């Protein structure tokens, strides 16, 4: 009674080696939103720029434990003061999968599907978007009280049918 025992538990985590120190971020401390299960998102985050807050330091074993959730909450409080509706912003690409991509702006993680990334159908989003990139995105909706941020990369690009009359005039032929 009253003694502390070590507990062994398997846990997915992100390991960042920064300044010769291992920083471990458990999966439970990574996201404020719900992301697909299975660790696929964590695996595709290699090369991403992540913000985190150190919550524990073990100097004896030369590692630290951190929380990305706390950092995201702090960033959200700061960005909630600004009105960014209908603006074009620079969003960080955090993770890219075959059908979905995770962007971060101002502490908000936003899942984008293929229809919000490109006008044309792409079988694999990883061909056009890469982890670690900074992409222009248009803010479609921003409700800070409810924690809603909706982005679109597609709306920052010109529509493929704009100017089609000059490129392909009526009566022209292509051989």
What are these regions (language model features)?
Residues 1-175:
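Single-stranded RNA-binding regions, centering on S1/OB-family and related RNA-binding modules
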């Amino acid at each position: 009674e009253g003694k502390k025992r070590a507990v062994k538990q398997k846990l997915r985590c992100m390991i960042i080696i920064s300044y010769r120190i291992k920083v471990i971020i458990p999966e439970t401390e990574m996201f404020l939103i719900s992301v697909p299960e299975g660790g696929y998102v964590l695996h595709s985050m290699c090369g991403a720029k992540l913000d985190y807050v150190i919550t524990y330091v073990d100097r004896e074993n030369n590692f630290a434990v951190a929380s990305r959730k706390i950092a995201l909450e702090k960033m959200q409080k700061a960005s909630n003061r600004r009105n960014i509706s209908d603006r074009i912003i620079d969003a960080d690409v955090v993770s890219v999968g075959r059908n979905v991509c995770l962007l971060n702006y101002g502490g908000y993680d936003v899942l984008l599907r293929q229809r919000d990334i490109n006008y044309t159908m792409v079988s694999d989003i990883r061909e056009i978007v890469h982890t670690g990139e900074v992409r222009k995105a248009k803010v479609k909706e921003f409700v800070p009280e409810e924690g809603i941020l909706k982005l679109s990369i597609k709306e920052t690009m010109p529509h493929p049918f704009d100017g089609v009359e000059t490129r392909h005039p009526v009566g022209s032929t292509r051989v």
